[in-house]
């Protein structure tokens, strides 16, 4: 980062996955995953909150809904923890892209720092967050919702471009030994979280 290398961060701050859901109970406990990146990203002006985005505009999953003879009947259900996000930004990185499927996405909070930030992708206006730790069950596909549940909660950033001169995480810290290659501040750079 200090030498000008561009960075793409694909970070899961919540431990949850579809493969874990396909167990005997169809339930998992979504919990925070500590990655030790919080301080660095906070210094650069963003915070990935340990929450899950639940969106009405989501991709379907197929679940067994019964049997017809010896054949298992499969039915598609909307899985609200897998938002299907259409880019609305005019930034060249996402301009003209089709919908993008996320699984167990976490919202990004934008903080006031010197680094320029551009929201590349955000959830729909019919989305909200679910705190962690929280049980997630396949039975949630049958939940009924109303637009009032999402009022004022949507449009959550899930991808952000940061541009500028990033300071080292170790700036103003005592180094264990003298390092002639240490840079307190980097060159103009970009990173996507």
Model-identified regions with their sequence ranges:
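Acidic, S/T/G-rich, low-cysteine, solvent-exposed domains in lumenal/extracellular/periplasmic regions
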Residues: 1-193
């Amino acid at each position: 980062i200090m030498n000008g290398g561009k960075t793409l961060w694909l970070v899961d701050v919540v431990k949850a996955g579809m493969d874990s859901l396909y167990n005997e109970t169809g339930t998992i406990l979504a919990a925070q995953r500590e990655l030790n990146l919080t301080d660095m990203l906070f210094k650069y002006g963003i915070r990935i909150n340990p929450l899950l985005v639940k969106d009405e505009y989501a991709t379907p999953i197929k679940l067994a809904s019964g049997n017809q003879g010896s054949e298992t009947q499969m039915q598609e259900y909307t899985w609200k923890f897998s938002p299907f996000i259409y880019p609305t930004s005019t930034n060249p990185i996402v301009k003209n892209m089709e919908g993008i499927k996320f699984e167990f996405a976490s919202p990004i909070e934008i903080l006031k720092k010197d680094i320029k930030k551009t929201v590349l992708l955000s959830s729909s206006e019919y989305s909200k967050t679910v705190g962690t730790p929280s049980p997630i069950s396949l039975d949630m596909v049958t939940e009924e919702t109303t637009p009032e549940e999402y009022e004022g909660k949507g449009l959550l950033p899930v991808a952000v471009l940061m541009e500028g001169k990033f300071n080292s995480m170790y700036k103003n810290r005592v180094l264990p030994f003298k390092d002639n290659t240490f840079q307190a501040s980097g060159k103009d750079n970009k990173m996507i979280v």
